[in-house]
Swiss-Prot record:
Residues spanning the signal sequence: none
GO biological process entries: translation
PANTHER family according to UniProt: 50S/60S RIBOSOMAL PROTEIN L16, LARGE RIBOSOMAL SUBUNIT PROTEIN UL16M
Role: Binds 23S rRNA and is also seen to make contacts with the A and possibly P site tRNAs.
Keywords: Ribonucleoprotein, Ribosomal protein, RNA-binding, rRNA-binding, tRNA-binding
Alphabetized Gene3D superfamilies for the sequence: Ribosomal protein L10e/L16
CDD domains in alphabetical order: Ribosomal_L16_L10e
InterPro entries, A to Z: Ribosomal_uL16, Ribosomal_uL16_bact-type, Ribosomal_uL16_CS, Ribosomal_uL16_dom, Ribosomal_uL16_sf
Protein name: Large ribosomal subunit protein uL16
NCBIfam families: rplP_bact
Homology family: Belongs to the universal ribosomal protein uL16 family.
PROSITE patterns, per the entry: RIBOSOMAL_L16_1, RIBOSOMAL_L16_2
Name of the coding gene: rplP
Assembly notes: Part of the 50S ribosomal subunit.
Length: 136
């Protein structure tokens, strides 16, 4: 699963997920899966969607993952009283704003790409849409 090799600090503030996304265009492949909603994707969700797409295209074409989980989420154990410091890092998330391209695919027909992205979208907690590369 995806997570940073090393970070400057182990734990992070909760913060807010506001603003608009960068990386809104299909840059590498021909088709993309773009986020319509706002939220956060865990490393497990990113990997589950990648596996669903890979199975659908049966190793033809190429898939690019455009998001990386770089924010640590901490949790305190069950039945532990409040206080006594911040909990341990349990998983990593990527914050997603509307318009962000999450995955890209190239070297496959459009119908196959649509089907693969549909399977991947079912694994994700945010609303997504299918986009194609725009040539200026």
């Amino acid at each position: 699963m995806l997570q940073p090799k090393r970070t400057k600090f182990r734990k992070m503030h909760k913060g807010r997920n506001r603003g608009l996304a960068q990386g809104t265009d299909v840059s590498f492949g021909s088709f993309g899966l773009k986020a319509v909603g706002r939220g956060r994707l865990t490393a497990r969700q990113i990997e589950a969607a990648r596996r669903a797409m890979t199975r659908a295209v049966k190793r033809q074409g190429k898939i690019w993952i455009r998001v990386f989980p770089d924010k640590p989420i901490t949790e305190k154990p069950l039945a532990v009283r409040m206080g006594k410091g911040k909990g341990n890092v349990e998983y990593w998330v990527a914050l997603i704003q509307p318009g962000k391209v999450l995955y890209e695919m190239g070297g496959v027909p459009e119908e196959l790409a649509r089907e693969a992205f549909k399977l991947a979208a079912a694994k994700l907690p945010i609303k997504t849409t299918f986009v194609t590369k725009t040539v200026m």
